[in-house]
């Protein structure tokens, strides 16, 4: 089983990336269901199953049809109904291109947790990251000015050092919920104040002390 092509994506997922490949293969033996689907096909059969994208790309939409996210090999989905009493999904997922996923049911996932606690810990860490991300999105939505939105976005990217990699500007405007003109104005303002410096491609240098003082 260690040579199956979809195992690479599972090993790259938040659930198994800290484990050796052989251990991941052993945990998934007899517990993973591989499903393939065509471009445009909706996923409506993964209730109470955790999914891992193994090939292609999935698109995630809200109830109104707005694109929320795109999932690539190694990304996970389906956590909103796993180990809960909910009988429906809060988003709609469809294949942006011909794709494949691995599905793990509740009972199988519980058995994996019982067999290897490190997977349980990784799952909890993934849920914590999701909560932090949702809180950030709420703060972003509540921000009243373009400058506040960009500030929150950059702080969300902050790691060690002064450099961050941002999204392409067209996508960044969509993420922040503002038009391109507004985005360019606030970028130029922060550049003029010495808060940020745009470098090659999508890399920016940020003066975190000045940004936090904004």
Task: Name these PLM-found stretches.
Residues 48-64, 73-74:
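Glycine- and acidic-residue-biased ligand/ion/polar-headgroup-sensing regions
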Residues 1-39, 81-84:
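Cyclic nucleotide-binding regulatory module and flanking cytosolic helices
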Residues 153-214:
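Phosphate-/nucleic-acid-contacting segments
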Residues 38, 54-55, 72, 97:
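A cytosolic small-molecule/anion-sensing beta-strand core signal
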Residues 30-31, 39-50, 64-66, 86-90:
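A short beta-loop-beta micro-motif enriched in histidine and acidic residues
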Residues 114, 118-180:
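Polybasic "coupling" helices that flank or enter modular domains
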Residues 68-125:
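Cyclic-nucleotide recognition modules
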Residues 33, 42, 57-62, 76, ...:
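Short beta-strand segments in beta-sandwich/barrel cores
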């Amino acid at each position: 089983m260690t040579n199956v092509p979809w195992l690479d994506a599972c090993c790259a997922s938040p659930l198994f990336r800290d484990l050796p490949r052989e251990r991941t293969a052993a945990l998934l033996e007899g517990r993973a269901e591989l499903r393939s689907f065509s471009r445009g096909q909706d996923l409506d059969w993964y209730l109470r199953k955790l999914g891992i994208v193994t090939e292609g790309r999935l698109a995630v939409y809200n109830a109104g049809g707005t694109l929320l996210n795109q999932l690539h090999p190694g990304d996970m989905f389906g956590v909103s109904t796993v180990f809960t009493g909910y009988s429906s999904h809060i988003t709609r997922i469809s294949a942006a291109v011909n794709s494949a996923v691995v599905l793990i049911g509740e009972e199988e996932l519980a058995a994996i947790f019982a067999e290897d606690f490190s997977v349980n810990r990784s799952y909890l860490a993934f849920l914590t990251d999701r909560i932090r991300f949702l809180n950030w999105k709420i703060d972003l939505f509540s921000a009243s000015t373009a400058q506040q939105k960009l500030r929150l976005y950059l702080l969300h990217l902050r790691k060690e050092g002064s450099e961050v990699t941002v999204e392409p500007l067209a996508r960044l405007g969509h993420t922040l919920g503002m038009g391109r003109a507004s985005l360019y104005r606030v970028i130029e303002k922060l550049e003029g104040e010495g808060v940020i410096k745009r470098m090659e491609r999508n890399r920016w240098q940020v003066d975190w002390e000045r940004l936090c003082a904004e």
